[in-house]
């Protein structure tokens, strides 16, 4: 019986150790697949590791291969890998002898055609749109004249120069630039952080908070603009409390940030034009408005001056206003003296009449009493005159004060009168229109009544009107005599006729008896 473990059995196979075999396989694989291109779908991608390397797998419907992108290569990629993205990877296949595994070390990575990226964009667009990030109700209006503009873009290149130059030409304002990467690894994070950073600034802080933001980048391929399709960028733009203008690429380039932004500009230069107005145009408009305003003010002032002059011409002068009070005062003063004098004379005469009938002692007493009474009355009269003079003087002072304030009061009353006149004019216009409407309606009704009462309508029913030789209507047969020419008026015309006999009075008519004339008495014409 042969020994199965007999080492002396003849063989042609070389004997390898595990390490030798693994090393041989490694050399064979790496030599045969030193540079390969693999098409597949990214699976298990979780972003770069803390070390900066990225680990994931490429798969199709029947197989799977592990893949790795080293940190240095990952930073040079034009776009960020994403789960489910179909890509074409270029690199080399390596093995690990310690675990008998192989993987592809990716050196370049590109989407598997623009269709794959567009499909990914459409899927992301539907997802974010379903969340309401693109709703028109979320859009904010741009400020007409911002004081501070925040720009998120690369600090180098033509984009920032074009924006600054355009703003300086149109309306120079303060511009804050937040420098970011606009392409490659980390570009999306930097753009999103810049948008959130501007929104985090407090109004009135050490750094002025922008009134409007511009996120800008020059044109490029779909891969170059891919950072602006990142979900983190789109969400930051939609959450921005500051109005945001997106200006990514050329007019034909659309990215997802364009849908989330409040306004999309076709180019970075167009964004600058949307952000600020043209200063020269505003100055021209302000000058034109100022000229119109000054013209209106001048016209109003001229009208007011003319109105005041007309009112002043209509007002009497100060002397005319004071003439009547002065005359009355003078007449009162003159009359008072004469009245006192006449009163004194009358009293003295009465006193003399009474004194002739009195005894000397009684007369002396009465004279003393009357003299005292007269003195008292004279004192009261003097006080009365003084009071009257004081009152007249006070009235004159008040009249002068009223005359001094008369222009102001007249202006106030004129303004009120003008306002009342305007109101009365409008009310009168409305009332006149109503009255005209009612008058027209009444006239129309009366016209209809007049038409219904017109004798022409009666003639149409077969009647006729008889007129005498003077064209006067004949209403009684007795008014006609034989041989008189008459006209018969019908509805359609007139015919002439001749009466053959005189008219007979009605049966109930009585002839008036004639009184005999008195030959001895002249008749009266009346």
Curated annotation (Swiss-Prot):
Residues 496-526 are annotated as: Disordered. GO terms for molecular function: exodeoxyribonuclease VII activity; nucleic acid binding. CDD domains: ExoVII_LU_OBF. Keywords: Cytoplasm, Exonuclease, Hydrolase, Nuclease. It catalyses: Exonucleolytic cleavage in either 5'- to 3'- or 3'- to 5'-direction to yield nucleoside 5'-phosphates. One of its GO terms (cellular component) is cytoplasm. It is found in: Cytoplasm. InterPro entries: Exonuc_VII_L, Exonuc_VII_lsu_C, OB-fold_nuc-bd_dom. It holds the Pfam family Exonuc_VII_L. Bidirectionally degrades single-stranded DNA into large acid-insoluble oligonucleotides, which are then degraded further into small acid-soluble oligonucleotides. Belongs to the XseA family. This is Exodeoxyribonuclease 7 large subunit. The gene is xseA.
